[in-house]
A protein has these predicted regions:
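Structured C-terminal subdomain patch of bacterial secreted/periplasmic proteins
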Residues: 242-308
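Proline-aspartate-enriched helix->loop->beta-strand connector
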Residues: 102-111, 127, 232, 236-241
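Bacterial N-terminal signal peptides
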Residues: 12-21
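A short, structured surface patch at a secondary-structure boundary
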Residues: 47, 53-100
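Basic- and aromatic-lined ligand-binding clefts that recognize polyanionic substrates
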Residues: 47-51, 55-59, 158-212, 222
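Boundary at the C-terminal end of the N-terminal hydrophobic targeting segment
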Residues: 25-29
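N-terminal export leaders
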Residues: 6-11
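Extracytoplasmic substrate-binding proteins
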Residues: 38, 121-190, 275, 284-308
Length: 308
């Protein structure tokens, strides 16, 4: 009888130890880097909500779980998150729904550029990973986010594998791009046009992907430098890389293709040589190249165009 009681005590002790061990594992934190520096956040959190499309792209690439997404027109790359029965809306990128957050009780909130002003308020509901990508070395910041998210989800090796693949594809595109002459990033928006050069929000096109900028110095501005059709003929780049903002946000309006179909543009080298690339607007504008899926799709489009 004494032996049976002892065995029961031992088993009970083991059960308690396992329970405590599991609780400790669930409560464990991990140190990662985000836009603020080093932060301590939950390891393998049970409930994660996301206010950044680039972060959604990263999580999808890693095979991680998400429990709340912004009420936002999602690009084809993120179509899986349109099912509200699986991924309830938690407000917009600019205006989080705090009542929904209160009900979901997330263990981690991931937020970025468009939600930056709300991060202090969001942090009242759960720890926040800030994946904002600012000016400067954008690719390094994107790699930082991939490493942080993959570490939090407990799959750092997957994050490193994604980075290695991206590095290889960038090198291949850069080698092609440097043989193509000059290129100019052009955004169309409501019938108006603006261009972006090195140092702008689309700096990666030049400094990472290897497209050679035109000689004309372009004003660095959030909304780009407003230009005319005459400007396009004057600078006359070998390639025009066109981003249709109306298409990116799903707004009705004259398409970029229609806007550029005129005599002045017809006289440019880019038109004559069929060197106009209509970029994946959602990947460039909504996701800002900030996730592995968007990056790889954009690299493939450039590689295919430069390889013609």
């Amino acid at each position: 009888m004494q032996g049976l009681w002892t065995r029961r005590q031992t088993l009970a002790g083991l059960g308690l130890a396992l329970t405590l061990s599991w609780s400790a594992a669930q409560a464990a934190d991990v140190t990662v880097k985000d836009s603020r520096g080093e932060v301590s956040l939950p390891l393998q959190p049970k409930t994660v909500v996301v206010y950044d499309l680039g972060a959604l792209d990263i999580i999808q690439s890693l095979g991680g779980a998400v429990h709340g997404v912004p009420n936002q027109a999602l690009p084809p790359l993120l179509a899986a998150y349109k099912d509200q029965t699986k991924y309830p809306h938690i407000g917009s990128l600019f205006e989080p729904d705090y009542e929904k957050l209160k009900a979901l009780k997330p263990d981690l909130i991931i937020a970025g550029n468009r939600t930056l002003p709300k991060i202090a308020e969001l942090s009242k509901f759960a720890p926040v990973l800030d994946v904002t990508v600012g000016d400067g070395d954008q690719l390094t910041q994107i790699y930082r986010n991939i490493r942080a998210i993959s570490t939090i989800y407990g799959v750092p090796q997957k994050g490193e594998a994604e980075i290695k693949t991206i590095e290889s594809e960038i090198a291949a595109v850069k080698a092609k791009a440097q043989q193509q002459g000059s290129g100019l990033m052009l955004m169309t928006n409501g019938g108006k046009m603006s261009v972006y050069g090195p140092g702008s929000r689309f700096d990666m096109l030049y400094t990472v992907f290897g497209v050679q900028p035109v000689k004309d110095k372009i004003e660095v501005s959030k909304h780009g430098q407003a230009v005319s059709f005459e400007y396009l003929l004057k600078t006359n780049p070998d390639w025009l890389l066109v981003l249709d903002r109306d298409a990116a946000i799903g707004r009705e309006g004259a398409s970029a293709r229609k806007l550029l179909d005129n005599k002045l543009v017809h006289a440019t080298k880019a038109w004559r040589n069929q060197h106009i690339i209509y970029l994946n607007a959602a990947n460039w504008y909504l996701l800002s190249n900030a996730g592995p899926g968007a990056l790889r799709e954009n690299l493939k489009q450039l590689s295919d165009a430069f390889g013609r």
